[in-house]
Amino acid sequence: MGALPVTIETGRSLPDYLPARMVNEFAYCPRLFFYEWVDGLFEESVDTVEGAIQHQRVDAKATALPEAADLPQSIHSRSVTLANERLRVIAKMDLVEVEGGTVTPVDYKHGRPREGPNGLELWPSDRAQLAVQGMVLRESGYPCEEGIVYYRKTGQRVRVAFDEELMATTERMIQQAWRTAAAPGIPPPLVDSPKCPGCSLVGICLPDETLVSEAAEQEAEPEQLGLFETPGRKPVKREVRPMVTPRSELRPLYLNSQGVRVGKSGAVLQVRDSQKLLQEARLGEICQVNLMGNVQISTQAVQGLCEAGIPVCYFSMGGWFYGITTGLNQKNVFLRRSQFRLAEQEYFVRALARRLVGGKIRNQRTLLQRNHVEPKRATLAGLKEMEERAARSASVEELLGIEGNAARLYFGDFAGMIKPDENEAAAELRFDWNGRNRRPPRDPVNALLSLGYSVLTKDLTVACYAVGFDPYVGFYHQPRFGRPALALDLMEPFRPLIVDSAVLTAINTGMVTARDFVRVGGSVALTTTGRKGFFRAYELRMDTLVTHPLFDYRVSYRRLLEIQSRLLARVIEGEIGEYPVFTTR
């Protein structure tokens, strides 16, 4: 790699050139710049999609720009790429106009210009990007005195002169961007900025959530830390703006019927049996594809799903989650490096495991209080004691014992949350509960729980990949061949809230009946109809809105899984010190 334009200690390997578009992002928000250029994270929005389509039209008409010595009096060259070797920046220009021997870069923007005190003007980020274009043109010997941005929404061209002040300011910004990219930590989020609600990465960045988590930690500092004065470190009360959409418009696709085949026609998945078309699903309307048992999928369909960033998840006939296919969209390697390093740090593993297990026990207790006809006081008191012991535990091994004792108390009273079915007597199998069993499950309730935990493991594995984690390197759950340990870590507090609740809903509302099970040897399995009924109950639960106790806004459980995964990433990257485990009242 060529020398950087400034003298810095690089904490990571950097590309040779800084794109002008990334200077635009840095001027808008250094944190956004870091996510997009360093971590390789990006999220589409309506504006980014429309802007990309418009730039594709410009790029399709690419024409060469003559050398500076051979420049004609008038020419329009499109999609021109040049670099500045001194500053290590590169710019792809939508249009370069040549009039009277002088060149002018023209950049196309989707939005509208800024209204300044003296009329229309460029936004600061657009001005910086255009200045970089002027720099690369001058470096290549072209006379360039000004630039133009064409704003499509208003159809207006706004000019800016490339004076010494603008070019010097932009050069300093380029140096700051290189330093930020090379630094070990991510820039802090903007505080109460009006830029955040319109940013396509707000669901990844979580600016207000990160700041609120930091403030909550300050309020909860141990008493002994109060013996020391820490100037400037006072708790700040903040409200979280509702910038994250409560629900995703995308839905998972479950294919449960044995023998069906999945193909692709254009941007549409087609599900067929041997004779007819059964179902169609647009790629733009689904977030994942789940194949249960003997379901075939074509290479063309897999390729299309990988290109669209939609994972394909594979389950056995019995509901065991055993594989996933994803595209090459996992770019956040620096998060994974930190994850691997902290997985070897006993203090971090113990602290995170305490919170995960404590949160799980608290949520088990809450579910009993909500749904049990008459929960035993001894059970509730025992669970509270187990939660307190988890917070004081000295090792992961001790936590495993505490978790096991809490599970015995919780599942010992689980039957009190199942309503008796009047039609059950005629069925071969019943929703009797005699304790937790698995591998294989030996009764209908345990068959539902096992399937539910498998599906939730899948959803958190997908969330881990989306954030940039390696789902197989956990903290509380130690790595084991074929086990997504980190997904199992994250799902601990959600087992009772999502799966156990969905199982109770499926049974108590008749979405799954005792006739939807078959006995195979010593195990019990769901029929195709039974699995379909449970998936309906599970997705109903995942779509339920719940209030986050720390941020005080309502989101669906599916959205919550991603938020909590990203909060763990904030902990691992050192932005916040303690994982805010999700518990409900």
Indicate where each model-derived feature is located.
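Short histidine-centered catalytic/ligand-binding loop motif
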Residues: 109-123, 159-164, 290
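Terminal-proximal segments
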Residues: 236-317
